[in-house]
Amino acid sequence: MNEDPQKKDEPFFKDVEFKASYGEANQIPSQGIPQIAFAGRSNAGKSSLLNAILERKSLAKVSSTPGKTKLLNFFFVNRSIYLVDLPGFGYSANSHKDHEAMMDLLMDYLNLAKDLKCLFLVCDSQRELPEEELELIGTCFERNIKPVLVRTKIDKLNQSDLSKLRKKMKNIHELYPMLETVLVSNKSGKGLPELRKIVDSLITTVGTLVEGNTKKIEGIS
C-alpha cells in the first residue's frame, strides 16, 4: 500500500509534539480529544514503533533496558488526537510485583480513558501471543475500543517462521473475526503505511481542533 504523495523527507504527520507524562490513570484530564494507545510487553518495540509511525527518531524515548519506562506518555498529533505510549509489561527482568503494577495501570487506563478509541497491541512476531494479551483484545471489543494487533520485527522471520505466524494469526482471527492485524518491520517500513492510515482516518473523522477551544494537557512534575 502506498502513502499519499508527499515531499521528499517530509513526514506524513507534520505537527507532532510531546504533551505530558502521567504516573496514574486518574491524573489524566478528560478533554474529548481521541486517543490511540500503544500497549504490549516491555521488549515488543512500542516506543520504536511510535517513532517510526511518526517518522521522528527519538520522540518517544527508547530505553536499552526493557521495562524501565513506567509512565503514560502523551503525544499530540496534527492538533487532533493523542498517541499514548503505555508502560510495557511482562518483561522477565521485572519482578512479579512490577508486572502486576503495570497491568493494574493499564487496566486503570482502559477503565478511565473515555477518549480512548483505538489500542495498538504491539507483539514481537518472534514470540507467542500470551493469554493475557488475547484477553486484552477481548476487553477492547467489550468496551467498544478498536484493537489492532501489531506484529513487529517481521524482518527477522524466515519464510517457514512467517508461514507458522500466519497460521497462528488465522486461529486468533477465528476467535476475534473483526480483529485487524498488521505485520510490521521498522527496518523495511512494511506495515507502517497501514498504521499511519488508521491514525489518519481518526484525525479525518475528528477534524482539526482549534487550540483556543481546547485545554492543553499539562505535564506533571
From Swiss-Prot:
Cofactor(s) in the UniProt record: Mg(2+)
Keyword terms of this UniProt record: Cell cycle, Cell division, GTP-binding, Magnesium, Metal-binding, Nucleotide-binding, Septation
GO-annotated cellular components: cytosol
Segments forming domain EngB-type G: 32-205
Functional description taken from the UniProt entry: Necessary for normal cell division and for the maintenance of normal septation.
Family: Belongs to the TRAFAC class TrmE-Era-EngA-EngB-Septin-like GTPase superfamily. EngB GTPase family.
Descriptive protein name: Probable GTP-binding protein EngB
Protein species of origin: Leptospira borgpetersenii serovar Hardjo-bovis (strain JB197)
Gene from which the chain derives: engB
